[in-house]
Regions:
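Hydrophobic beta-strand scaffold residues
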Residues: 30, 50, 119-120, 161, ...
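Rossmann-fold NAD(P) dinucleotide-binding segment
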Residues: 54-118
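Helical "substrate-binding/catalytic lid" subdomain
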Residues: 149, 168-292
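Rossmann-fold dinucleotide-binding core
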Residues: 99-182
Length: 313
């Protein structure tokens, strides 16, 4: 481990809290900031310092950012009260973990470069439960030296980190990842509803699927939601819609047809129109069941989510 560097953390939502908590518990010198200070306060019990204003983080050598949208990223970095508003900015590296567009990431890189700060794009695969299970993974792009400097701290949070090259390549990987997330979830919902309408209990069908060559960490992880209809939010339909839109935008930019992504986006929009954004995107299965003329009921069967040996979105 190199000489410890002071770490700043911006954004204490579901993901940000779990990630910052792992950093603090690993002994990193972490100062956290969140728009609602009360959400960050519990991290003090794990050794983190809680900043009163964003500019306080400008004294940190490395600053992580984990917020919801590109608008939020711009505000916390370059807004009137953002990180760069401090009189003395000592930050040398920003590690930006949010899901944002290629264009937004490139713009952020230029804003930071003008202030002598490097950007490491480092979006993630996983959710808060996956983070707590120690199964998160990073995909990173930017200067190789920045990745090498960040790696010890990334590994405090997650066991896996992949470096894919310079610039904004990690954003493209994350966009592709989340397009796959949406398409796979919709496909899994369709075949599970088909099996049930033919008479196969959902838990039995998914038990087979999870043990087959088609099973995956992700299908196991979503099995409890599909079987017992527990849609406590891990990732909202609106956030998935945002990522599908990013994917479709990228498809247009690079002239790659994405018909399955486009159809999944339309289905997701229909789900959102029914006012389900306070629940998990796995509710796609209920939406599809209604289209098939059946009403799902919880099966109340104990099923494993696979987190003891894996994780998922």
């Amino acid at each position: 481990m190199p000489t410890p560097i002071s770490i700043g953390w911006i954004g204490i939502g579901r993901m940000g809290y779990a990630m910052a908590e792992r950093l603090a518990k690993s002994g990193a010198n972490v100062t956290v900031w969140n728009r609602t200070r009360e959400k960050a306060q519990p991290l003090a019990a794990h050794g983190a310092k809680v900043a009163n204003k964003l500019a306080d983080l400008a004294a940190c050598g490395i600053v992580f950012v984990m917020v919801s949208t590109w608008k939020d990223v711009k505000e916390v970095i370059a807004g009137p009260h953002g990180l760069l508003s401090a009189k003395d900015v000592r930050t040398k590296l920003v590690i930006e973990c949010s899901s944002i567009s290629l264009e937004g990431s490139a713009e952020l890189r230029e804003v930071l470069r003008a202030r002598g700060i490097e950007l490491l794009a480092a979006p993630v695969s996983g959710n808060a439960k996956v983070i707590k299970a120690g199964r998160l993974s990073f995909v990173c792009s930017g200067p190789r030296a920045a990745y090498d400097q960040a790696l010890p701290y990334l590994r405090m949070i997650a066991p896996a980190a992949s470096y894919v090259g310079e610039g904004e390549l990690a954003r493209m990987v994350k966009i592709c990842h989340n397009v796959f997330l949406g398409v796979v979830t919709q496909s899994l919902a369709e075949i599970t509803v088909l099996a049930q309408k033919a008479g196969v209990p959902r838990h039995a069908f998914l038990d087979f699927m999870n043990q087959s060559v088609m099973g995956s960490t992700f299908t196991r992880y979503k099995t409890p939601a599909f079987v017992n209809l527990d849609f406590k939010v891990t990732f909202t339909p609106e956030l998935l819609r945002k990522d599908l839109d990013l994917g479709l935008d990228a498809g247009r930019r690079f002239d790659v047809p994405l018909p399955l992504a486009s159809l999944t986006r339309d289905i997701l929009q229909s789900l959102i129109g029914h006012g389900t954004n306070d629940e998990d995107f796995a509710k796609l299965i209920v939406h599809h069941a209604k289209a098939a003329g059946i009403a799902l009921e919880p099966e109340n069967v104990a099923v494993d989510d696979g987190l003891s040996g894996g994780g998922g979105k």
